[in-house]
Amino acid sequence: MHVLSVSSLKGGVGKTTVALGLASAAFSRGLRTLVIDLDTQCDATTGLGAIGEFSETTADVLQAPRHNIVHRAIVASSWGKNQSGTIDVMVGSPRSQAHDNPYPTINEVWRLEIALTKVERDYDLVIIDTPPSINGLTRTAWVASDRVLIVAEPSLFSVVATDRTIHAVEELRKGLTPRLGVLGILINRLKPFAPENEFRVNEMREKYGSLVLPTVLEERSALQQATGSARAIHSWPGQTSQEIAAQFDEVLDSALESFANQETRRPTRAERKAQRVTRIMRGQTLDQVLAFEAEPGDDPEEQSPAEALGL
């Protein structure tokens, strides 16, 4: 089982739409897919057609990641009603905001990772839709992830947010979860022939090099229509929707290639403990641990994004 977080530290870049597009690509390929909705707006839950009252949600899982709670928080998406395969969602909740502490403890950020050990054999791919912030929910998602896909739009503020995201991922990788890495930067909502957009795309390619994925998603109404109708883009009619679906297939291929040589099993409880430095104490915050473990000269703010990731 592989885990991919879809993230951006800037809101409004189409992060949830990208997460759903990737889920559509994985589902259409026959992968057993789980989407975890950690964004308190719960748009991924709605987009997957999971509407109603639920006994358990992500908020409950993050409070107590026990086997029965984890399984009750996962429901089937309406996407799979007329197709074979698995596409499920761990239901989002506004109550998850209680777990979005800007200074989460080590115990708190490990809870989603613990929860995923309860469904290790049930899924091939887990996609996490994260909030547009670097607080507890996003860090919890990253600790449980193998890769982070950074979604960016071609704008100045998005470029700045992308830089912050890269450095934050690298800080967490060095301090707590060595398997974590950036899959790449996906440029979304490109407006063709818009000079400012073209300038920012070129700027990102010059700044981040190979981190910028070759696939660029243009702003198209078909994608918004499919998402708004709680339908998978791969099942939405029309030539344009099939072109969009093919682009998400390309991004999924990049993810699967990145996962190819990686261990798929989640670490056991003993292994998780072994990964932690011995000086981490119960109740210590993640920021305290990362600051304590930093070595002189390792400040990611002094490195380029490519250098920070060892590229």
What are these regions (language model features)?
Residues 1-311:
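P-loop NTP-binding core
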